[in-house]
Amino acid sequence: MALWATSMRRAIPGISKAFLGSNRVLETAGVSQLSKHLLPQWSGVPHRKISASATNFNDKVKESNTPDANAYIRSGHIKAAEHEKVKKVVVVGSGGLSIGQAGEFDYSGAQAIKALRESSVHTILINPNIATIQSSHSLADEIYFLPVTAEYLTHLIERENPDGILLTFGGQTALNVGIQLDDMGVFARNHVKVLGTPISTLKTSEDRDLFAKALNEINIPIAESVAVSTVDEALQAAEKVSYPVIIRSAYSLGGLGSGFANNKEELQSMAAKSLSLTPQILVEKSLKGWKEVEYEVVRDAANNCITVCNMENFDPLGIHTGDSIVVAPSQTLSDEEYHMLRTAAIKIIRHLGVVGECNVQYALSPNSLEYRVIEVNARLSRSSALASKATGYPLAYTAAKIALGHTLPELPNAVTKTTTANFEPSLDYVVTKIPRWDLSKFQYVNREIGSSMKSVGEVMAVGRTFEESLQKALRQVDPSFLGFMAMPFKDLDNALSVPTDRRFFAVVEAMLNQGYSIDKIHDLTKIDKWFLSKLANMAKVYKELEEIGSLYGLNKEIMLRAKKTGFSDLQISKLVGASELDVRARRKRLDVHPWVKKIDTLAAEFPAHTNYLYTSYNASSHDIDFNEHGTMVLGSGVYRIGSSVEFDWCGVSCARTLRKLGHSTIMVNYNPETVSTDFDECERLYFEELSYERVMDIYEMETASGIVVSVGGQLPQNIALKLQETGAKVLGTDPLMIDSAEDRHKFSQILDKIGVDQPAWKELTSVAEASKFANAVGYPVLVRPSYVLSGAAMSVIRDESSLKDKLENASAVSPDHPVVITKFIEGARELDVDAVASKGKLLVHAVSEHVENAGVHSGDATIALPPYSLSEDILSRCKEIAEKVCKAFQITGPYNMQIILAQNPDKPDTPDLKVIECNLRASRSFPFVSKTLGVNFIDVATRSIIDQEVPAARDLMAVHRDYVCVKVPQFSWTRLAGADPYLGVEMSSTGEVACFGKDVKEAYWAALQSTQNFKIPLPGQGILLGGDRPELAGIAADLSKLGYKLYVANKDAAKLLQPTSAEVVEFPVKDKRALRAIFEKYNIRSVFNLASARGKNVLDQDYVMRRNAVDFNVTLINDVNCAKLFVESLKEKLPSVLSEKKEMPSEVKRWSEWIGSHDL
């Protein structure tokens, strides 16, 4: 059987491992009595013989019927569980999105809260991430927008008196704080029960020493390793296990603080850095080049276990799984390997005592049955979100039910409605996950990828073959990727052997253009030859299309072969020299079209009512009927810098309102981390590309009633006009108007026409013209391309010599659209206006104030609402501008404007208001303004878009509020080795957090502590000051009065601070180890670096100061206005921090207490 399965898989291209099934018998309860009576083998073919006792059981359940939960319990073989008697449970969220911990925890936390509410448990969520779905009022009973720290959670527990807490749905943040609270005795003192996996198990899985001992007890092999807590111990350990070694950190996230060391020097600097981030590291023998395989396993308290999904990394061990291409189910494992690792996973989860979901990662030798366990995550993780979406098995929901004491056999599968949760999913399709990196946004960043994660998001594609699935995924990662495509490299062998974010394209280049054999590529990359043979299939079809060279050479056979191999219309059009629309028309004439298939978790072996859908050309029938004519909502696609969970909140809010108003909804999205791709958010969910081709295919097949393009960020906007021009009904604002607002030239002309002020601007066609204009208006100037998200290629230029490079860069971003150059106004304030209109009339709006001056991207800005320093006159002028703009563009739906407030020398009392940007779609601040003001802007926008139950206009800014909410950015600088932590017009934050307070200082104080690893420096500790801003003197004077010891790196900086004195310390810019010793010697716990420009190179003192503050895990403040606000917050809040009498801070309040009602 094993040989048959393996040979069949190799013989039939793309046949999925799980499709062959190969005797995946349910591994269930440890009680032998129970295992005899469970239904055998429903998750694959062929079936095993049924034992007599099992047959008796089947007589009761009737083998022909799909099993159901009640039948299991009625059979008498399984008792219903004793459920946890909890009435009020705290769910701990994960905080702001960062590299290594992203939207997957919004999805898992939201599912957990749904599961608790179903069981009539009162839920209290603590999560400062205001952009999440889980922090919407319709889910948890009460929400605290507060830092997920031991201090704030203790206050919450004392205030709310819960009887249970869930720690496994908030990533590493929740897990770490839970362990901390347990060590402090907070749970025991307050009689709070940790639900699900016990704390002792969490500690064992996180502490590398305990973990190694636990696995040795059951003879499970792990890589030879030594746990250490000092640099000297690390060096001794490396001698013991021998180089090369890998360092892994305890209690860390996404491989933070891990890496490979080939010698003593590399290990010394790496160990020092890792130990500044985490108390313990593991020095382990490197297994680079082995296969990496993962299993997602679920266990309940009655010891029932199932493996939900196994996944295989396309990349060999050595690249963090979060930065790897991952395929599910595994494609290259033999049946023996599959079962060996599956059995080990179940053995591990039982021995550790996990109650809920668990992820086991293995290294598997490519040449033998030898394997090692790399790590176990005894919590929901990024891989669990992927496994859940890949199989359709609601992992987080099931884990939450198990935490309440339910067993797997008694839980119905919430997705299929016909099976129990004790069913192992079976797949008749292939899923491919590819990470998304945004490394090009960062100056000096190292592009190499290794054991520490750097990607900011991921995509998931579903196809019936590996080729189809992979090509879809490649296009989903970035609209500029056509799919299977090559990129040129100066040193191709190096690009293949040293992995970077572009390595895949180096593999294609080697195969397609340089004639490298599969063996040679395998030797350089260690990628399995099975995967490389599939790439060779794609290369063959690619060349075939290239040789045809014309549209009319495309016959049905070649067209079908290309589509089955995953080629898009656009990709084919480039290869045959035609337009995308021509290829589409020819394809339809040849009657080649995609088929809609279900992800039903049962490989169609049982009827399942599921709404998870995908399209494939490797099929011959549809799995569904098209008679609902639903409204399509286009999601936001992959999370990347500039487009993140905020847009998922918008998409889900829109779909929920549509359903509330009686509309059937069709969601199109491909991001496995999102709530929008959850099984119960829409009538139909297409896990599909957000390309013109695929959206139009779905629109035509579904005969949809319309498409909403304004809630998914930039991707849907980019295809809106083309959809409308080819017959689709785009709902809301006319795409021609969207185009006018996106094109900087058209947009500026319209503003001039309606009398709305803007900075001086000019459309550019040559560098000479640009130079002439810049000299006329005076430097600095801002170069802005059209159609961008998060300020890509937008630059402030301060002199003529920089102009040429920047302009060429901007042209590369959007070659079809002209570039506009604008006068950049230094020292101006910036405001955000978020609004909703209906047929050109303003319905609601919010005016938020940036703390930083204009010049910092709005996505990286600290934003306060209600504004804390704006006059009534400025607010009414902002409203007037919002009204003029929505009338001019005839807006129906959401829109956002950025306005700068600049001093007018002629009228000092009346500052100028100039519009610098306008997006005719929802912006990333929509969840923030909605939750702060208590009105869901997307709900209002959706009603406006479909012209149904549109609410009357309201001026929300005229209402007096006795609170302020402050949103601050979450950066992931620690992940991006070498990147300069400097704020500018190009966005670099990966997430956001927001907190409420009685004033801006209190809200900012709480919000800062909500960001990852932010530590408040205490009086008596050292603060290092740097930069050239004159405001440093006043800030230093205040810090000195508060009792901090001040240090500077040179005499010029010391002069700048006068009359406040600061000690000049040695500052070796080239010697990181010596610099670390100086930070330790002077107990430097914070760096205030207020430089007016980026460093010219990596030896620039300000750059070194900022970068090493991040590397040494020291609090960094890098903006003048934020520094001033932070000092004001310290003055107000330090007395209570230092007081021995610990009182409840005034910011510890429920969201409902702040906003006063659930207007949302």
From Swiss-Prot:
Binding site for Mn(2+) 3: Q898, E917
Spans annotated as Allosteric domain: 1013-1144
Reaction(s) the record says it catalyses: hydrogencarbonate + L-glutamine + 2 ATP + H2O = carbamoyl phosphate + L-glutamate + 2 ADP + phosphate + 2 H(+)
Any single GO CC term annotated in Swiss-Prot or TrEMBL for this entry: carbamoyl-phosphate synthase complex
Gene Ontology MF terms: ATP binding; carbamoyl-phosphate synthase (ammonia) activity; carbamoyl-phosphate synthase (glutamine-hydrolyzing) activity; metal ion binding
Binding annotation for Mg(2+) 4: E917, N919
InterPro entries recorded: ATP-grasp (IPR011761), ATP_grasp_subdomain_1 (IPR013815), CarbamoylP_synth_lsu (IPR006275), CarbamoylP_synth_lsu_oligo (IPR005480), CarbamoylP_synth_lsu_oligo_sf (IPR036897), CbamoylP_synth_lsu-like_ATP-bd (IPR005479), CbamoylP_synth_lsu_CPSase_dom (IPR005483), MGS-like_dom (IPR011607)
Positions bound to Mn(2+) 4: E917, N919
Region (Oligomerization domain): 479-623
Enzyme Commission number(s) from the entry: 6.3.4.16, 6.3.5.5
Annotated region described as Carbamoyl phosphate synthetic domain, given as residue ranges: 624-1012
Region called Carboxyphosphate synthetic domain, residue ranges: 81-478
Chain sites annotated for binding Mg(2+) 3: Q898, E917
UniProt pathway annotation: Amino-acid biosynthesis; L-arginine biosynthesis; carbamoyl phosphate from bicarbonate: step 1/1
Amino acids binding Mg(2+) 1: Q361, E375
GO terms classed as biological process: arginine biosynthetic process via ornithine; L-arginine biosynthetic process; urea cycle
Binding site for Mn(2+) 2: E375, N377
Ranges for domain MGS-like: 1014-1160
PANTHER family linked: CARBAMOYL-PHOSPHATE SYNTHASE [AMMONIA], MITOCHONDRIAL (PTHR11405:SF53), CARBAMOYLTRANSFERASE FAMILY MEMBER (PTHR11405)
Protein name: Carbamoyl phosphate synthase arginine-specific large chain, mitochondrial
